[in-house]
Amino acid sequence: MQDFQNYILGAWEKGKGTETKLYNAINGELLGGVSSAGIDYEAVLNYGRNVGGPALRKMTFQERGRMLKALAFYLLEKKDAYYNVSAWTGATKIDSWIDIEGGIGNLFANASLRKQFPDLPYYVDGVAAPLSKGGSFIGHHIMVPKEGVAIHINAFNFPIWGMLEKIAVNLMAGVPAIVKPSEYTCYLTEVMVKDIIASKILPEGALQLVCGLGRGIIDHVDARDTVTFTGSAATGKVLKGLPHITDRSVAFNLEADSLNASILGMHATPDTEEFSLFVKECVKEITIKAGQKCTAVRRIIVPENLIDDVQNAISSKLEKTKIGDPAVEGVRMGALASKLQVERVRESVLALEKSQNIVSGDLESFDVEGADKKLGAFFSPILFRNEDPFNNIACHDIEAFGPVSTIMPYKDMGEAIELAKMGKGSLVSSIVTPSNQEARDYVVGAASMHGRILVLNKDCAKESTGHGSPMPLLTHGGPGRAGGGEEMGGKRGVLHYLQRTAIQGHPTTITAITEQFQIGAEMPEANPHVFRKYFEELVVGETVFTHKHTVTDADIVNFANVSGDNFYAHMDATSLDGTIFEQRVAHGYFILSKAAGLFVDPKKGPVLLNYGLDDARFIKPVYPGATIGVRFTVKEKMDQEKRSEDDIAKGIVRFLVDVYDETGETVALATILTMVKKLDQSK
């Protein structure tokens, strides 16, 4: 018998004895045992805080992003081994793809977020707040990595995705993790973590693994730490309410299984493509991962005049679904994760059956391909029908965490929304309809009790990721029964692991802290011109003060002729009554164009190109006779990795373009983005 191990304190260790025996979900074969007994969790937490944390916090967001990208590519090369082990969980190839490659996709997605963060170990949040009349005192916000650990207590259904979707976020933020997968499928998590540790891509202490029961794993958490829990609502609420969690104000994110609903719109009649899409989506959500998904469709809400059509269509497809060993050709649904899960789902089905009828499937009589039904953890797809869902409410309270769903009728969209909300808070719902108005009515009406809503129609179906797939750049979580938590969500998720702190001081001081130029800070004159300097030589705040240009009527006419912009305010002085303008006004885009002519040093140098313009604002009208100049300031610098050995080493520099007139007042502001060559071409 194999003993599955924990990775703690920089070493692989077995726990004392055997807490749990693990079995192959397909054939019942004993795989081994696992234990976390004897682990000193206080030492484990301190190892993450004192070893992994400092190493991650020294890295910039750009470096952490590149680290995640490297890890993603590394794990993709190893994926075949994960598929082999994933089969032990009862998963089909498609199920495993969601878990393995879907999980790795989270690493890629979070790595790409580095473009949204500064080239710093911490994040500068929002814009400065002016706090004084003279401008010598301002406020801002920074967000620094929390100095604790992220403890992730995960469910059995996605041993890889469940880990990677969480650690991708905390690692990007600069926070180490301790992962506790479900003991029942921890063997798959262990295989991947062994590869992660062997790769040495993550700094030591950034990731630890506890494969056993993990009793005591959150006993020593404090305000620096974050606990995330994915699993049953009952267990999650107990953990979240522990006195030391509340007394120490420990951040706790709860993502619980929920009674998600899919709604067939009233316009999606059997002759529409949307009807077929709805049936296909419901069948998929019942059978993929054998229904063991926190986002699976548990309630199928359809117009009362279409309930028979929908029932017959779904039942027909479910009855044709082959159950068994995924290695056998034609098998479309594997096993539940364990015999224990079979018993739990069976109990829930029997409880539901007291108030509604099974119209497809059977608890006892079903065929299994290539395996022994008695040895494996197999379960038949079950479809219930509830004729009176407003009074027979068990379907809104009891979740059978397997291939089980209930179909129910509604009279109008108001009823459909009310039924969806009777789940008391869900991770996701979906509506399938060809009507945009119907979609809008549902989304606006149901959104308050749902974390995500999919609107599906024939126009997006080909590329839709489906009802049950949380996306790394969108939030995952939900109100009420779903736990009230939120994870992933791209940049939003990363911010959960950062502490926001308000800072106050002189603009020059705030510039030094944020490494972003703040209005009112010192502006030392650049010498030589900033376009003559390489990336490493540029200093935030240094400024080019340009020569001046007096705007003429000819400038306005010539720009109108070149651009084709003959808007009346620029060209017809007789049409200005009732406007804010005193006379014909120069084009805002002319002002910025002329500003470029003033601040650009035209000779070939380190500046490779200008690739964008952000935050352009035209603040004050410029009339013929006004004289403009430019304060051209290094606003922010961001390193950029080389894409290949032959690539030019470069960085991104953002310059503030402050155009002012003869009174000294700003007339236009913009930020230009440039690529600037580095002196050191080796990295």
Question: What kind of region is each of these model predictions?
Answer:
Residues 1-135, 320, 337, 448:
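N-terminal Rossmann-like NAD(P)+-binding subdomain of aldehyde/semialdehyde dehydrogenases
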Residues 26-33, 201-204, 223-224, 316-317, ...:
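Conserved C-terminal structural/oligomerization subdomain of aldehyde/semialdehyde dehydrogenase
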Residues 30-37, 52-57, 131, 151-152, ...:
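Short, well-ordered beta-strand elements within core beta-sheets of diverse protein domains
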Residues 118-277, 410, 463, 485:
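Rossmann-like NAD(P) dinucleotide-binding subdomain of oxidoreductase/dehydrogenase enzymes
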Residues 195-200, 226, 235-390, 414, ...:
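ALDH superfamily catalytic-core signature
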Residues 526-586, 678:
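Catalytic strand-loop segment that frames the active site of acyl-thioester-processing enzymes
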Residues 530-540, 618, 622-683:
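HotDog/MaoC-like acyl-thioester-processing domains
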Residues 577-636:
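Hydrophobic beta-strand-centered segment that forms part of the acyl-chain substrate-binding groove
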